[in-house]
């Protein structure tokens, strides 16, 4: 059959002008196995309609759905030294960067922009997990700090969507330095009395969790997101005990008071706009009947009196 498959079929296809069908037209839900057409999934912000499972979404797509009418102005990220340690593991770090940049068309994993949500001016910063696992390095650290400086200069709130596996090992201590540096920028934001809201997406771990991802005024998590410092497998091997079901999930963290609410991506924009109106004392906007989906997964934590 090989000669038919490898020779005859391509010849017939070329004669008839038949085009090959792309492999990514249908996306499989990892939880239910449901197949969803890629255009439908993109229109639904990469949330599976039936199960509500949140797929990974690119930084550009997230900003497009988050800002009013999909309109925003990108904030230019500062330039940094590339591969200062001349790091090499299985391949050179500089080569890894070139591969990701060519594949995704971005310099690193942070995209920041100016725009409005329900008419409110805002700065939004998004980590793209597709670029080296959203790892925190010099470039991403500088980009986050630049976003805070821009928000302070514009006197507007900042919303950060965190998605990261932690510090970038290829940059060593220079990567770890970004943890205190971003913390200082957050303190400047607080001194300016401007809201800083963090949206924790799947996954948010490592040094990112240990720094700017857990220093917001309000912490919102997407459903089913894994949030923690070390991964559950590492913790279980260290303490040699079975972990509770759903350990480090956004719902588990909500139940134990580590996040303020769990909100569906489909309701994120309306929820954040409502919070900012309260924090900034903006007039309340008339709330349309469809502002929240019927099966909204918004949950607000209840703090017990000490």
UniProtKB/Swiss-Prot annotation:
It holds the Pfam family Carboxyl_trans. One of its GO terms (molecular function) is acetyl-CoA carboxylase activity. Coiled coil: none annotated. Residues 25-294 form the CoA carboxyltransferase N-terminal domain. Pathway: Lipid metabolism; malonyl-CoA biosynthesis; malonyl-CoA from acetyl-CoA: step 1/1. SUPFAM superfamilies: ClpP/crotonase. It catalyses: N(6)-carboxybiotinyl-L-lysyl-[protein] + acetyl-CoA = N(6)-biotinyl-L-lysyl-[protein] + malonyl-CoA. Keywords: ATP-binding, Cytoplasm, Fatty acid biosynthesis, Fatty acid metabolism, Lipid biosynthesis, Lipid metabolism, Nucleotide-binding, Transferase. Residues 287-306 are annotated as: Disordered. This is Acetyl-coenzyme A carboxylase carboxyl transferase subunit beta. It comes from Bartonella bacilliformis (strain ATCC 35685 / KC583 / Herrer 020/F12,63). The gene is accD.
